[in-house]
Amino acid sequence: MREAIDLVSADGGSANGGDHAPRNTAAAIAQLQAIMADDVGPFRTKDKLLRASKGILALSRELGKRPPGRAAAFDMQRLEWFDLRNMLAVANAVTWSALLRPESRGAHQREDCPDMLPQWRVHKQVKRIGGEFDFTTVPVAADAKVLAS
């Protein structure tokens, strides 16, 4: 929690946290949307997902580690920075969850893995711990009841 408070109140200095040149947030969001639509949509392959992961990483690096400018009320540039930062985190979690599930299930089809695999009848849980994602699997509720009895 302290880390989040420090980030919100941080003085980013230059237009992009002193890390990079200023970035048009709307253009970055459009680029992220294109990456997700093209490579992480309902029809996926390992290659597309890896390409998406690289694109998301590049956008994250371009965004920088600190928000632009100084903390001030109603600073839309800072707000957009935090919005994009959160969008990139969710995009990364979705992409890696898909990479870690090498099968087709429901509306999401792996063109390189067209079959449903019984061992993947699980839920994926994603937690963010210290800036890193932790992926775990838990049984589907119906299976959990059978296992408990």
Predicted regions and their residues:
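Glycine- and aromatic-enriched mobile tails/lids
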Residues: 1-149
